[in-house]
Amino acid sequence: MLPPGADTVVVRHGDVGVKSSHVQSDMERTLRENLAAMLADRTVPGDVDREWGRILVRTPEPDRAADAAADTFGVVSASPAASVSPDLDAITDALADAAEEQYHEGAFAVDARRAGSHDFDSRDVNRAGGDAVWAAVEDDFEPEVDLDDPDLTFSVEVRDEEAFVFLETRDGPGGMPLGTQKPLVALLSGGIDSPVAAWQAMKRGAPVVPLYLDLGDYGGPDHLARAEESVRKLDAYAPNRDLDLRVAPAGDAVGRLAESVGRTRMLSYRRFMYRVAEHVAESVGAVGVVTGEAVGQKSSQTTANLGVVDRATQLPVHRPLLTWDKQDIVQAARDIGTYRDSTIEVGCNRLAPSQPLTAAPIESVRKDEPDALFEWAREAAAAVESTEVTLA
């Protein structure tokens, strides 16, 4: 819902504002660059500036620009607004115009916030603005005022040299601007969890290098396509970064594990997987690995077994979904657009033993797994191919 004359998007950021002044300046610059890239990626005209303590997008298409801002990491919220002179008459005129165009029924409220030096305060804006809205609609409707639960809120932000009138605020993802942290290798399985974990890492500012292990006969025929689709969806949140999917051949190693390892087979596979990711991370300058594992979701993801697989790599393994319930992961996947049919069998289930250990001693795992396991991982990483994933 846009006010008449909307020409600006007021962008608010969260965690950026709690940093030291130097760090905040760097993060705001990165956020502005990411916003500009997001606008360009969606062919939305606009200029991104920092004025009056806010990041502002000046644009002839505020509706589309607000949507773009609301998909940018580091943005808490975005409001398409009309910019007016910061005097009471201009503000009340803009509120009256907005009421005439957008008010149709129900209760309304005026919510003003002010910063800077003016000859009025926020309460003056609320009173005068409320009167202006009422006068604009009382002949055609039966308006009501409800400050606690209005059907429509007329919002005003007043700054030293400008005021903004807006009727809605769109939530952004929050977090940190993408690129303010070092990159991580994101292990993607083609399932639901791993893209959500990658998205969460991106939300905290870490670019991701997507890595998919091709399980050969042990993987479903559509798993690579599902991983590619996940990367395509993630790429929409990172317009100034190339999220090419790297594919490591793992079919031979998995086949050997299936033939030679019993109840600890899945742990050895995950140790192999982590070591492949470590080699890829070294080659691309990533500083860690991010996975979609959650405590207790599978036998290999108990607190004891996670400790066993962690010992296969010297890199930190980040698990954003560690304590999430499955239904929350599914909902997050739907929200960010990476959800795929959860009833489709995940290929590595065929690798799982019938009676896996839930607390395998590291000594037993090492004893049972092939001596050449980590050499296979090195070979798989050396054979990685990069697949360019383009937006549909």
PLM feature segments, named:
Residues 1-185, 199-219, 224-226, 230-241:
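RNA-binding accessory domains that recognize and position tRNA/RNA substrates
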Residues 9-10, 34, 140-144, 150-186, ...:
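Nucleotide-activated chemistry modules centered on ATP-dependent adenylation/adenylyltransferase
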Residues 61, 191-192:
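Short beta->alpha connector loops
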